[in-house]
Amino acid sequence: MTPFLLFLTFFCAGPLTLQALGASPSTPLSEDRIQVRLRQMLDVPDSVRGSVSLDLKSVTLAAMMRSDSFRSLLSKIPMIPVDRLEQEVLTDATLFAQGKQEWNRNQPNSLFGTNRFDQTSMDVGVEKRLASGTKLTLGLSEFRNNSAFGSFGNVDSKVAGGRLNLSQSLWRDFFGSSTRKLLDSGKAKSEAKKIELESEIEDWFLQLSGLFHQVWMAQKRIEATRASLERKERLAGLFARRKSLGISEEAEQIQVESAVKQTRVQLEEMTRLLEKQWSLLVVSLKLGEEDRRTDPTLIPVHLETALSEPAKDCADPVDSNRDIRQLELELSALQLQSGVALDQARPELLLDLGISTNGSVLNAADEFQTRWLNTLTARFPAYTIGFGFRLPLDASIEKSRILSSLSMTRQLESQLSDLRARMISTLDTSCAELAMLGRHYRLYDGIERDMKKRIKLEETRYRQARSSPFSVLQAGDELYGTTLSLHTTLAEWWNRHWSLKKTKGLLFQELDAWVSEKTGKSIFSNASAGNMP
């Protein structure tokens, strides 16, 4: 037997397996076992009938529930309200309480002084600053005194007291203008952090979707390469019969042998690439060793081929883009803080108002009801009014804060203007490319159908000795290239589609809708409830 016939015997004896190609051994699983693993992997309920395949939505939801990378993102959720809470400290209520016991045996310094004075005092109340810049203090107190005045004897008294004090800024924090700016700046910063996290989740999804498309594309390359190898092996069989009749040349033999060998090498390389990308996807989904060692060519991976028109997404402005919104909120917070710095450089004019009342009982065992009734009904009131004025002569700290805020504001304004211009340009480019990819996909789909007809015609002509092996190989290679272009265009279309969604600020809403559809809650609600890692 000639070397060429040995070569044909090896390649035509049966279908080419991964083990024959030198691929790493993988766990042999039946189709039923693969379906069981997929259902476990994707948390598919038993009520869902039919076969299950990996699609981008199911992979994304599984990764959200399992992956360490997504868990790392969710760990930032508790940091979102920090800036808002730091500013709300200004309006937090404070409860205070204190008590004191005094035993005084000092020598009297006058004829009417006491030579013994014992006092027990207790004071409790609450302080709060309102958003109007008003500081309120409400307090209740109790004093019990026992005094000895020499020959005059002992005097016992019990005094209850109440007070309400109000302090209002009339200039620097004019009826809370500066306080509200601080509160609003904290809210803007927290909202900016939330949007920043949403943008990071979008970026995380784009990386995951890119990996998913690579796995799908690697499978399609292997399918196309196997089909190409089958065609070339079929051609080799036809060539062997013609050679036995003495109507083939050595150059044609070399050409056919080389084509089969090259395709075999391509198939091995693509198999290795698929195994590598499948391992990365398994890690992203935090699956087990059994899943990693499963033959990835047996996993059904689905990518939608019905392409939508991007006209609607391209018509809307980019103002909802999360990067733009984040910068706008950061700029708003900075402008509010600049206003606070200007306020702090102004003079301070304070108005203080107060009302106090008391109830006192002398030399009585315990008249609790009497003294507190007098206190709470303000039977014996006292009123105070006062003004205070402070003028900063240098205000060095305030000046430094104003200059710093002014510089940072100008930087953010420039960044925002540049980002908005770049996003508009990116939107126009993405829309044009997306429309082009959609047209190309439809063209490649038609070309592939035509090329399949052509390869059949070329093989028929070769059987009839009306064509050469080169023509058959060329037709097969052109079909192979067209098929790869078709699948590459589809994967690229989906990559651009999701990138366009991010540019428009619509991607996170879609991801949130996926999670809500599965769990009934949003991403952040699930994370807060502990339903996500």
Place the predicted regions along the sequence by residue.
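Regulatory alphaC helix of protein kinase catalytic domains
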Residues: R37-A62
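Small/polar, glycine/serine/threonine/aspartate-rich low-complexity segments that form flexible
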Residues: S47-S51, G99-Q168, I299-A306, S338-G339, ...
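Sec/SRP-type N-terminal targeting helices
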Residues: R71-M79, E88, A131-D156, W171-E196, ...
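Amphipathic alpha-helical coiled-coil scaffold segments and their short linker/junction regions
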Residues: E127, K187, S248, E252-Q253, ...
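Periplasmic alpha-helical coiled-coil/stalk elements that build and connect Gram-negative outer-membrane
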Residues: K194-V318, E433, L437, L457, ...
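A short glycine-centered flexible hinge/capping loop motif at secondary-structure junctions
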Residues: K243-E250, Y462-R466, T503, L507
